[in-house]
UniProtKB/Swiss-Prot annotation:
Lineage: Eukaryota, Fungi, Dikarya, Ascomycota, Saccharomycotina
Superkingdom of this protein's organism: Eukaryota
Binding site for substrate: V301, T302, T303, G304, R305, R306, R307
Subcellular location field: Cytoplasm
Protein's name according to its UniProt entry: Adenylosuccinate synthetase
One Pfam short name: Adenylsucc_synt
Statement: the UniProt record of this protein carries the keyword Phosphoprotein: no
Residues noted as binding GTP in the record, renumbered to the chain: 11-17, 39-41, 307, 333-335, 415-417
Species, as recorded: Yarrowia lipolytica (strain CLIB 122 / E 150) (Yeast)
Matching PANTHER family: ADENYLOSUCCINATE SYNTHETASE (PTHR11846:SF0)
Length: 429
């Protein structure tokens, strides 16, 4: 059976640390969607590993790792990331696999990502993408003109000529759209001739791989990238990523049935953050927001961008819980709230004097909502040295209990610092 770790807000919740802890007990770790547009750091002993595209299970020497069919891969970045972790002593090539059905991100996708953002910025509608080419790649995938891993590595007669033709055609359509941007497709073809040989040993048919793992009762951990509020269908569209970041994307991205999933862990930051543009009802453009930003070190791993910060939003989390069906939650960064006198939690939205039933799909409404806040007392004490959940200040436990009751979902872990030892386990009935 498979356990799944998903982000419940707008990303950067701290999924990597939970995955890191759970990785000690698993046989297979799989990514199901996204690309190298996410990022987190895992610390093992004194060594820090930065992950963007590769599965975190690589830090476990007994764990097999898969990039599933829903993942999009920039092959040069794949090897750069692999080399960076190998240079730190991690031997993992024989434990890393890539689905033959993954779509490929090329440099021209990244170029057009930037051009699209420039175009949108003139109308003040830029999305604030990472510029990694993820959106344009999913766009070519959806339009059925994309190039998959098997197109690159196939050794069937005529396969390489087909790859060349596909790439030339794909670049040509983008140059018609954006003008003759600086991109030498013939040089790119030469470059990918070698990359095809390098990538081929990693490539497998991921569907039987996952089926056999499930059939053999292997312990499987699936790590979602991004988060529910960035989901293409259920997020704050169009200020979203280009894949399904919820539980649905797990099944479609790996080719597994819902019945193969056991636990769904939702990772929740104790407050709310967001990177890039888009509505953010509980955002605090004041000293509270600055405090959360500075104490929480809210800067992106992938882009280095400063994150927007605000109070915990239970309207968002309720919506996220309804869609993903979390079996339990991991609250992270509780310690960032340690010095605040009082805490506000959004428990509803009002629009034109009317309380909304759920998180609205209309951004014009979302930008105008008035948050209904519940105020809870802070605990004004350092939680970073606490090693047992029972030792938390009473007001901290009341804060967690409030979240559990509102969402009707138990909290299983609470994070009070950056290290593994800072993750407190809480009994779940």
């Amino acid at each position: 059976m498979a356990d799944v770790v998903l982000g419940s807000q707008w990303g950067d919740e701290g999924k990597g640390k939970l995955v890191d802890i759970l990785c000690d007990q698993i046989d297979v770790c799989a990514r199901c969607q996204g690309g190298n547009n996410a990022g987190h750091t895992i610390v093992v002993g004194d060594v820090k590993y930065d992950f963007h595209m590769l599965p975190s299970g690589l830090v476990n020497p007994n764990c097999q790792n898969l990039l599933g069919s829903g993942v999009v891969i920039h092959v040069p970045s794949f090897f750069d990331e692999l080399k960076a972790i190998e240079d730190k002593g991690l031997n993992c090539r024989d434990r890393l696999f890539v689905s033959s059905r993954c779509h490929l991100v090329f440099d021209f996708h990244q170029l057009t990502d930037g051009l699209k953002e420039q175009e949108l910025s003139t109308t003040k509608k830029a999305i604030g993408t990472t510029g990694k080419g993820i959106g344009p790649t999913y766009s070519t995938k959806a339009s059925r003109s994309g190039i998959r891993v098997h197109h690159l590595v196939s050794q069937e007669p005529g396969a390489w000529e087909e790859f060349e033709s596909r790439l030339r055609r794909l670049v040509g359509t983008r140059q018609k759209r954006y003008g003759d941007f600086d991109y030498d497709v013939e040089e790119e073809i030469k470059r990918y001739k070698k990359l095809a040989d390098d990538l081929r040993p990693f490539v497998i048919d991921a569907v039987p791989f996952m089926h056999k793992a499930i059939k053999a009762n292997k312990r499987i951990l699936i790590e979602g990238a991004n988060a529910l509020m960035l989901d293409l269908d259920f997020g704050t569209y169009p200020y979203v990523t280009s894949s399904n970041t919820g539980i649905g994307g797990v099944c479609t991205g790996l080719g597994i049935p819902p019945t193969a999933i056991r636990n769904i862990y939702g990772v929740v930051k104790a407050y709310t953050t967001r990177v890039g543009a888009g509505p953010f009802p509980t955002e605090q453009l004041n000293n509270v927001g600055e405090h959360l930003q500075e104490v929480g070190a809210e800067f992106g791993v992938t882009t280095g961008r400063r994150r927007r910060c605000g109070w915990l939003d239970l309207v968002v989390l309720q919506y996220s819980t309804w869609i993903n069906g979390y079996t339990s939650l991991n609250i992270t960064k509780l310690d960032v709230l340690d010095q605040l006198e009082e805490l506000k939690v959004a428990v509803g939205y009002k629009h034109n004097g009317k309380v909304l039933e759920s998180f609205p799909e209309d951004l014009h409404v979302l930008e105008q909502v008035e948050c209904i806040y519940e105020t809870l007392p802070g605990w004004k004490s350092d939680t970073t040295k606490i090693t047992e959940y029972a030792e938390l200040p009473e007001n901290a436990k009341k804060y967690i209990a409030f979240i559990e009751k509102f969402l009707d979902c138990p909290v299983q872990w609470v994070g009070v610092g950056p290290g593994r030892s800072h993750m407190l386990s809480k009994s779940v009935n």
